[in-house]
Amino acid sequence: AKRADIVVFLTGTNYEKPADHHTGTESHDRWIISLPGNQEDMLKALYEANNNTVLVLETGSSMDISWAKENVPAILEAWYGGQAQGQAICDAIYGDINPSGKLTSTWYNSIDELPKGTDSNFDRDGRNGMMEYDIDDWGYTYMYYGKAKHGRQAAKPLYPFGYGLSYTTFEYSNLTAPANITKDDIINITATIKNTGTRDGAEVVQ
C-alpha cells in the first residue's frame, strides 16, 4: 500500500449473512450499523500506510462510517450493483463517468442515535404496547432528524437524506411554486438548473 499511487479499499456487508447483525434483510433487522469484522481496522491500517485512499462501500443500507468521513479523502457508495458493478466503480473512480446519485436514507453517526423498538415512549396511544412511530413529532428520520424532541438532544446526521456529491457543481435559480394549495391540487414547481463546473453531469433536483 505504501508504494501504490492510490489505494482502493472495497468493503461492506454480506447480504447472504444477515445473522452477523450488521446486515438488514427482509426478515432480519440489524443490531449494529458499523462495518462487520475488522474492516474498519483494515481501512485505518491502509490509510496510515497511504493517505491517498479511496473507500468503496458495497452495502444495502446506511452505515456508521464516521471515522472514514473525517479521514478518508474519497468515499463511493456502490450498494449492491449487480454484475456490471466492477466496471461502474472503475469508471467513477477514473472519472470516465460523473456520479450523480443521492442517498435514499439518513446515515447516522452511531447506533445510539437510533430509537429502540422497545422504547415505551413510542407507545403513545396505549394500544396494548403497539409502537406509534411518528417521524414528525419524534424527529427520528430524514427531514425531521435533528430536532430536540421529548428530552432527546438535537443531533446532526453523518449524511442527510438526499446527500450526494459530483465532479461538477450546479446552481439553482428562478424557483417558482404556488403560494396557495388545497387538498388534491396538482402542484407544479419549476427551477432553472445550471452546470457551473467544468465537467458534464446530471443533477437530482430536490
Mark where each language-model region is:
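Hydrophobic helix-and-loop "lid/oligomerization" segment in the mid-to-C-terminal part
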Residues: 1-70
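Secreted, periplasmic, or luminal enzymes acting at the cell surface/secretory milieu
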Residues: 58-202
